[in-house]
């Protein structure tokens, strides 16, 4: 399979033939000078085909015979729609949107977009997609999209985990504006630390990512792009409340200080104080929780000099309380009076991104990314403590330029990472330091028509992982109009933090067994894998309505993996290095179709074949459905008045096939579970009433079919006994949840 894939990658350029395109430059007027606009959106009206301008303000998009309305938009500027009847090179100058009475031709932007011209398979979820659901935090932002699977990690803490290509989030590089964010100590709960209202968009990259972003990515990358003080509303507030007792407040305050500086304060708070036990197992269905999350952003932009910069300062305090209904922490903490758990996290993040574009050579630029974080968690689960402090320093210097012409571009740079871990595990202390220095080079060739490739290589020296190379390759080919074929191959390597990544097993009676393999991290060797992938997308027009269909296939082949074995013994969770094969295969097919004006349908089917060599033999991955189906339908009415009022309706249906449940055959009969779960369906829906462009209210329901997993907690009647386990989760553990909220902004 690997040889065939590599042969395909080598032969692909031989099949290239030309395709007409529309290209150009987007500029703005700054003191009489035409300055390139970076990040402007360029797309064909009514389609999901779009691109974003680069640092030089340039773009290139396939010419569309079916739709000749090209839309150019950028926040703070009047949207422009051009009538393009033939391939050409154009220059668009944006104008400040200063007149609300101006008559402008508008077009609806797709909620989810995939570019035909990007080398990587990147799915972009913009604000329209994120507003289809409550999206209280990053972990809840993928419910309407099939690229990411979301489920509860256990039945005690109420934490959601995500999977991509059949692999859990430690194998996914999760970044915030391309700076690593959810890693190390934050793997278990870090997805809940980014409020949904802070998100401008999310980019999901399947398979091998860019060497510019490091060597740890194996399954793909999720990048969260935050709102910018310069373009966000001057004031924004979001109130949210649900019948499960969760209340939430989000407030944004932004101020443009002068022509170059802007700042914003983003304040988030959530609280749940109600104890509910709807399934009568004696445990709280959703943990009591409170969070205070404050972000201060500073944005600097000097178009005359070419300098831009962002400074971010964030403080987080998050507390959770879970366990039996009668648990009182002041009396029962770390005793057998009642089973309970408290997780208290404090976190500080400081980061900076600075970039410079050379005035006379717009194709040349450099950027510097730096960040520091201090993550401190104090936790206990029943009688077992788990504390971790993780301090991290990250820096990445990137230089962009060309080789002779703009068809041949490159990125080169240096990166540095430092991590210090201090853990207290049940009754032992463990500490380690990791540091790495790396250099990377990434070459991009684009013929300006229908073919491009990105070939990258990085070399790193790591005090634990040693010296190693990370190669990655991406190819893009447009065989005919409205289509794109992509292929990728790449290597990833990481050291596994087995305790913090698997904290859910503390909420059980399983003993932790770590097999010493002579490695330098918990006695285990680092994880290493190759990822191979290919995808094809074709847009179409049926009955006068546009749509697209796509198919992708990815293989992740582990050369070494830390096997987390919960099948060998139901009273243990064992960790050991892979002896044999571990392969994850993923196939996904998607159809997006515009049924009528403002009425969109999305259908997705996904198949997984994930297997690993365990001590018992080769087994399929536990608690992972081989088959999944998603259907999403979204409708919005025409504007009801000149203020932008309208109704929005959205519904998402998920069908999840049967899943293998880890063996409990040696347990007493009353504590045994079936070998496989039953398939189930889940339905989410939301209605939004937009009164004006500044004010809207919404009402929604999660799991409205009220499906609940049977026996989410094994031996809940004996939590200090040998068979207690809250980690056998394959479906929803809470019933239907109704929520409502409002959004208000002042520009």
Question: Which residues make up each language-model segment?
Answer:
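Short acidic/polar hinge/loop motifs at secondary-structure boundaries
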Residues: 59-62, 179-206, 294
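Flexible loop and strand-edge segments within Gram-negative outer membrane beta-barrel domains
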Residues: 272-293, 299-364, 372-390
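Gram-negative outer-membrane beta-barrel transporters
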Residues: 449, 550-558, 575-662
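N-terminal periplasmic accessory domains that precede
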Residues: 87-93, 138-141, 160-163, 175, ...
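C-terminal beta-signal and adjacent terminal beta-strands/loops
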Residues: 493, 655-664, 688-747
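Extracytoplasmic beta-strand/coil segments of soluble accessory domains associated
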Residues: 139-180
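Short, acidic, small-residue-rich periplasmic hinge/interaction motif at the N-terminus
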Residues: 27-33, 38-45, 71-77, 87-131, ...
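Membrane-embedded beta-barrel scaffold of Gram-negative outer-membrane proteins
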Residues: 365-379, 478, 486, 522-577, ...
